[in-house]
């Protein structure tokens, strides 16, 4: 079964933040971002007979995103999952990007 603590979280925002950057309005051209995201899917190359994942290019955060992340970090250095999901969604980032930045 699902532990009681997990039931109270809003899982729709958790799942939604991975799917697209579009609806949050932080980006000047959402269509460009969607195209770029498709091209950045991790590609697998065969190197010396071994499959090798090609790393995604380093994320460039906008000054708006950085300012918001820094403000939040000054308030609290640790984000619980629902807070991370909410912050990621509000900034048009993935939860992974927010998690890595906080590390």
From Swiss-Prot:
Its main location: nucleus. The keyword DNA-binding applies. Residues 54-103 bind DNA. Residues 15-31 have a biased composition (Low complexity). CDD domains: homeodomain. May act as a transcriptional activator by promoting terminal differentiation of interneurons in the developing retina. Likely to play a regulatory role in the development of the ventral forebrain. May play a role in craniofacial patterning and morphogenesis. Belongs to the distal-less homeobox family. This is Homeobox protein DLX-2.
């Amino acid at each position: 079964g699902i532990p009681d603590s997990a039931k109270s979280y809003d899982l729709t925002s958790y799942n939604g933040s991975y799917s697209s950057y579009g609806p949050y309005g932080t980006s000047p051209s959402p269509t460009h971002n969607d195209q770029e995201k498709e091209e950045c899917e991790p590609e697998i190359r065969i190197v010396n007979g071994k499959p090798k994942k090609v790393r995604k290019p380093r994320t460039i955060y906008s000054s708006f995103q950085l300012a918001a992340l820094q403000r939040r970090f000054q308030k609290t250095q640790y984000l619980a999952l629902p807070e991370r999901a909410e912050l990621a969604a509000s900034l048009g980032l993935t939860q992974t990007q927010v998690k890595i930045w906080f590390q």
